[in-house]
Amino acid sequence: MKSIYAFEKSVHPFSDVMGQTVSVNPLNKKWTDLFVDYPILKETLDGLDNDGKGHCVISREMIFREKDCRRKAILTLLWGFPRGYRNSKTHKNAVKSVVEIAEENNDKNLTPEMFKFMIGKAGVGLSTLSKILYFFEYKVNGNPAL
């Protein structure tokens, strides 16, 4: 079976993929309920541009450029789940876990042990983890995580 990288030249990149945005309602109860435990969440939402309808706007470029790991983790979660998770316990666990993962110091080369550690965190499934790996620019066997 060919590697996905064998098709790299066949795939045409989208124009301005970094400019893609999502809107997040900062008053969504699933987010506001976590402000007390995670002030970084409120600080992050308060610092975002507003779309004129009261929603915060997050772009891919903004997430990639963010240098603060905790804030980047929150932006990644907001990007991937702008309406929050269905289950409030999972939602709270995911916020806690992505912040913990972001604070881990490593060389961004994903090892099987790191993968097990990350996927073992409460509230972190493959969907959440894939976003963390992508926005934090992890590599798998020397290749960028998709």
Model-flagged regions — what are they?
Residues 129-135:
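Short hydrophobic alpha-helical segments that form membrane-spanning helices or hydrophobic packing faces
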Residues 1-119, 138-146:
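An N-terminal alpha-helical hairpin/helix-loop-helix interaction module that forms a charged
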Residues 122:
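Active-site acidic-Proline motif in GNAT/NAT acetyltransferases
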